[in-house]
Amino acid sequence: MSFASETKKELTHLEVKPCCLRAELSALLRMNGSLSFSGGRMAIDVQTENAAIARRIYTLLKKGYDVAVELFVRKKMRLKKNNVYIVRVTDGAASLLRELHIVNGDFSLIHDISPELVKKKCCKRSYLRGAFLAGGSVNNPETSSYHLEIFSLYEEHNRALCELMNSHFFLNAKTLERKKGFITYLKEAEKIAEFLNIIGAHQALLRFEDIRIVRDMRNSVNRLVNCETANLNKTIGAALRQVENIRYIDETIGLDSLPAKLREIAKLRIEHQDVTLKELGEMVAGGKISKSGINHRLRKIDEIAERLRAGKPVDFHKSL
């Protein structure tokens, strides 16, 4: 089961207060419901491929409203296709839609989120939970990028969802138009974690955070290893260059031509090619020399080698 499916399954087991029941159910019916007419009677059909969500809708309807509710399963004939679960409301469908602020008194569709539904903070949380159950998805935190989104057919409702998430919960949600509708989405791991907490998916939140911590630690270790590897490669490269330059000087004018201080460092570097500058400084006969002091002398040796390669004269009085 995917992380998104596990999260939704957890949400379908939450207990809700009567006021919150209405808010959650409004989002579920608004986003997954459709109207049908048979024999002059209107019915509401709510379709989902998730059995747990279908049971949730059925339970909320039976618990909160005096309406006739039926549950159907439509089996898809194609291979690897999930069943479709249909929750149908027949008697009382019109009054239910008005009660849930999905339609106005004249039966025109309300695309916005009615303030009556989300007066309390708990109801705001419940509406977002219903919206996520109806049209939400969230990436597995082990994947390359963090992403949570809620899909809506209508732009106005999508904007209202984004506004609810940002103005009351400061989630920094953004909206985007898709081919068949609109999405409100989150990309920041911290905000996704906050959203899971807001809608009551606490087990999913704990799993998300556990995976995120391990992932962030792994990334930090990788960055540290990469940095240390780069520094090591740089150090090895510098040592090889120094040895090459010292050997070139030895072959052209001889190391004995170098001033005593440079000659001593040159011989030490040839003898100890794999040691650090600090370790090299501790080998000097006259006493310990700092890392910067050793680096200065080696740079002077590099300059002498470059001048010799270029056929330029070398003034050893300026080489210290």
Swiss-Prot record:
What keyword terms does UniProt attach to this protein?
A: Cell cycle, Cell division, DNA-binding
Q: Which GO terms describe its molecular function?
A: DNA binding
The UniProt record lists the keyword Cell cycle: yes
Question: Cross-referenced InterPro entries, in alphabetical order?
Answer: Homing_endonucl (IPR027434), Sporu_reg_WhiA_N_dom (IPR018478), Sporulation_regulator_WhiA (IPR003802), Sporulation_regulator_WhiA_C (IPR023054), WhiA_LAGLIDADG_dom (IPR039518)
User: What are its GO biological-process terms?
Assistant: cell division; regulation of sporulation
Q: Which residues bind DNA?
A: 276-310
Q: Does the keyword Manganese apply?
A: no
Give the protein's biological function: Involved in cell division and chromosome segregation.
Question: What family is this?
Answer: Belongs to the WhiA family.
Q: What is this protein called?
A: Probable cell division protein WhiA
- Gene name of the encoded protein: whiA
